[in-house]
From Swiss-Prot:
One Pfam family hit: EFP_N
Subcellular location: Cytoplasm
Lineage top rank: taxon: Bacteria
Name of the gene encoding the protein in the UniProt record: efp
Name of the protein in its database record: Elongation factor P
Biological pathway: Protein biosynthesis; polypeptide chain elongation
Keyword Cytoplasm assigned: yes
PANTHER family: ELONGATION FACTOR P, ELONGATION FACTOR P (EF-P) FAMILY PROTEIN
Biological process according to GO: peptide biosynthetic process
Keyword Acetylation found: no
PROSITE patterns: EFP
């Protein structure tokens, strides 16, 4: 059990049998009445944000969650196929569970999968990944306006904006949280 005094951003809790992640919290101590904690919680199944208020000192259940190293094998229709590196068991994970992480998964790459009661509910990505540009228009000579960008498609199918000097075949570093170009890799 987790007390409200232990709340922090990123903490995972369980309410009504569903896992939530604390996105934001604030302790309140009004002049009259008991203290309470206001939170914004993200449902880890749907991604929906909800507001929830807890009385100070209230205890909530800690979810049965684990992280496990899993290898992304391939995409099967709308599903992503992941393999457990310990048991070599393969599982199909729906695209809506993987959500935006799907644009950063390369075949054969290992990532941490977030499991709830033995079922994959998300992928923990590193802060940035290195991906190859597979399609982009060539930069036009003399087109050098400051911070000018052009659209590019990466090897995973993700589309982002890159600077004009980036060409097809270049490897670039991409921020996994914002899908922004961070730099060129050698």
């Amino acid at each position: 059990m987790i007390s409200t005094k232990d709340f922090r951003n990123g903490l995972k809790i369980e309410i009504d049998g569903k896992p939530y992640e604390i996105v934001e919290f604030q302790h309140f101590k009004p002049g009259k009445g008991g203290a309470f904690v206001r939170t914004k919680l993200r449902n880890m199944f749907t991604g929906r944000i909800t507001d929830q208020t807890f009385r100070s000192g209230e205890k909530v259940k800690k979810p049965d969650m684990a992280t496990k190293e899993m290898q992304y094998l391939y995409k099967d229709g709308e599903d992503y196929v992941l393999m457990d590196l310990e048991s070599y068991e393969q599982m199909n994970v729906a695209a809506d569970v993987i959500a935006t992480a799907g644009g950063f998964l390369k075949e054969g790459e290992t990532n941490k999968a977030l499991l709830y009661n033995g079922e994959v509910i998300g992928i923990e990505l590193p802060a940035s990944v290195i991906l190859e540009v597979t399609q982009t228009d060539p930069g036009v000579q003399g087109d050098r306006v400051s911070n000018a960008t052009k659209p590019a498609t990466l090897e995973t199918g993700l589309g982002i904006n890159v600077p004009l000097f980036i060409n097809e075949g270049d490897k670039i570093k991409v921020d996994t949280r914002s899908s922004e170009y961070l730099g060129r890799e050698k």
